[in-house]
């Protein structure tokens, strides 16, 4: 009986060890997959998709090219997963994607919004755009690829134009309702408010040392906008 108990015990230990090994292998595979996507985004944001090879990605990760294909079947699949990850992060964290200025729950603490409040809120989002690695690299990748890839061009239009205009239009309509701003063409007002900020963000991409200068420009620009359209 003792022998049988020992045998059963050994079998149980063996099963547990195999399960642990399998779990470790799965985690390692997931970690490698995530690292491939991270490295691919790094390379795509600098060199572009076309100029980046599978070999370059594998070398940067520290694996063989053949090993990379056990995680992704092609460079296109890597790109698809990179874009999906960037878009998920954007949808989850960007105020431009998530904010609804017609939602009373969102606006209930913004009834007394001042020009300074708006400037601070916008400056905070600009810093996030500049310093969140996924957002920053994703933007740069889209800028490079928008002329080669229709899907990415459409995504670029959405995240760097449509969502931004929609956000600022919503904010302006809200401020008009609160009698903070006078009524005018809200789409044009949104473009007037957001377009210089977009230009300054692009300037920071090229010349990071000018960030504080840009922050001051954003602050003065928002205050002047409120001054011009004040009711």
Task: Label every PLM stretch briefly.
Residues 154, 158, 162, 172-223:
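Hydrophobic/aromatic-rich alpha-helical bundle segments in the mid-to-C-terminal region
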Residues 35, 39, 43-85:
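Helix-turn-helix
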Residues 75, 82, 86, 90, ...:
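Hydrophobic/aromatic residues within well-ordered alpha-helical segments
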Residues 81, 94-133, 189-190:
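Hydrophobic alpha-helical connector segments
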Residues 1-31, 101:
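N-terminal intrinsically disordered/low-complexity leader segments
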Residues 89-93, 97, 149, 167, ...:
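A short secondary-structure junction motif
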Residues 130-143, 147-177:
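Amphipathic alpha-helical packing segments from all-alpha helical-bundle domains
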Residues 221-231:
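C-terminal alpha-helix
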């Amino acid at each position: 009986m003792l022998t049988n108990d020992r045998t059963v015990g050994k079998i149980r230990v063996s099963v547990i060890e195999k399960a642990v090994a399998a779990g470790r292998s799965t985690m390692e595979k997931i970690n490698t997959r995530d690292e491939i996507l991270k490295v691919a985004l790094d390379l795509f944001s600098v060199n572009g998709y076309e100029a980046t090879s599978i070999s370059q990605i594998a070398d940067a990760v520290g694996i063989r090219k053949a090993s990379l294909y056990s995680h992704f079947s092609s460079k296109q699949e890597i790109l698809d997963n990179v874009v999906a990850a960037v878009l998920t992060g954007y949808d989850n964290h960007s105020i431009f994607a998530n904010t609804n200025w017609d939602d009373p729950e969102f606006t209930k603490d913004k009834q007394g919004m001042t020009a300074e409040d708006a400037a601070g809120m916008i400056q905070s989002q600009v810093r996030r755009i500049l310093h969140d690695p996924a957002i920053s690299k994703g933007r740069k990748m889209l800028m490079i690829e928008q002329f080669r890839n229709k899907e990415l061009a459409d995504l670029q239009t959405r995240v760097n134009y449509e969502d931004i205009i929609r956000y600022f239009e919503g904010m302006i309509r809200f401020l008009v309702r609160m009698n903070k701003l006078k009524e005018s063409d809200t789409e044009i007002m949104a473009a007037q408010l957001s377009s210089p900020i977009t230009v300054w963000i692009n300037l920071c991409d090229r010349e990071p040392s000018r960030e504080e200068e840009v922050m001051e420009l954003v602050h003065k620009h928002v205050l002047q906008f409120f001054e011009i359209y004040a009711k």
